Amino acid sequence: MSGFLEGLRCSECIDWGEKRNTIASIAAGVLFFTGWWIIIDAAVIYPTMKDFNHSYHACGVIATIAFLMINAVSNGQVRGDSYSEGCLGQTGARIWLFVGFMLAFGSLIASMWILFGGYVAKEKDIVYPGIAVFFQNAFIFFGGLVFKFGRTEDLWQ
């Protein structure tokens, strides 16, 4: 059985290894922007509190803080490869990263709760604000993962 991509010609002269950080950063930025764009769109379409409770923006703010916390710690600091110990050293970096991931997963779970508890279970006519809250948090979460694990730190080796 042959693959369906065998006929696709891809130039071997493109070196994606050197552009990995650039591509990962752009992809993470697009995901982050898309998440906030979706929730801003929902807030503009449904400005009343009856259709869209604007306290639901807290999930996106917490996801953004988690995005920043996760990416503030380098992989070298978590592994203990850094040259200076800093304030708390490797243990502090791991705790910081753990709290960041807890906030990220918590905001994603809370956005699902908002979608299903606030819109689907109540059988509201308008479900788009709940979907927007979920997709905002999902895009920010996956953008944070791409930005954290899609880049390399060994630029000079």
Curated annotation (Swiss-Prot):
InterPro entries: UPF0220 (IPR007919). It comes from the Eukaryota. Keywords: Acetylation, Membrane, Phosphoprotein, Transmembrane, Transmembrane helix. Pfam families: UPF0220. The chain crosses the membrane at residues 26-46, 58-78, 95-115, 126-146. GO terms for biological process: late endosome to vacuole transport via multivesicular body sorting pathway. It is found in: Membrane. The modification N-acetylserine is found at residue 2. Disulfide bonds: none annotated. Its main location: membrane. One of its GO terms (cellular component) is endoplasmic reticulum. The modification Phosphoserine is found at residue 2. It is a multi-pass membrane protein. Belongs to the UPF0220 family. This is Transmembrane protein 50A.
